[in-house]
């Protein structure tokens, strides 16, 4: 056999198959304008006849927005909560304005309370422009400082720190006290001349030194005030 025999035979088969598909009926998915399937019958025709009526814009169903089946009319919307909310808007606005007024009154009360607030001396700020008050020493602090001054009129930095920790004072306060005490001592001994001797180192404080400490605690020291103002 030659190859042309097989080619002619296959061609004849495919030609016969094509004729079979040409005689086949169209499937149900193809919608012809006037074709009806025998399986569906009159039901399909009835549905096709009702479709234009359902989607007709001139139908009474689309003319009235309130369907009779729901039992609602045009006046039924007056009873909805939206209408009552619209009617209550002025009242709500008045309540908001009243609340704002109450807050303003509350702020005025707070302002009056702050104006009447009492400020104590210890609550004030100690800025550089503020004049420092006069430092006062207790009886015990004055006595210990007088004892220290009796032994030595000038303190070293180390001894000043020790005395500050022992007497709960600052170094500046102790330095100011000793400076004022030295000025007072010079005024007391200026008539004695340059031969006035200082208290010997290691001497025990006498009753006169204790009495001087008590007197210094009671009287006002003008020189101390001048030093603190500087």
Swiss-Prot record:
Could you state one GO biological process linked to this protein? anterior/posterior pattern specification
Q: Where is this region: Disordered?
A: 185-230
What segments bear the compositional bias annotation Low complexity?
Answer: 194-213
Q: What is a GO molecular function of this protein?
A: RNA polymerase II cis-regulatory region sequence-specific DNA binding
Which keywords fit this entry according to its UniProt record?
Answer: Developmental protein, DNA-binding, Homeobox, Nucleus, Transcription, Transcription regulation
- GO CC, one annotated term: nucleus
Q: Which domain of life is it from?
A: Eukaryota
Q: What does this protein do?
A: Sequence-specific transcription factor which is part of a developmental regulatory system that provides cells with specific positional identities on the anterior-posterior axis.
Q: What is this protein called?
A: Homeobox protein Hox-A7
Q: From which lineage does this chain's organism come?
A: Eukaryota, Metazoa, Chordata, Craniata, Vertebrata
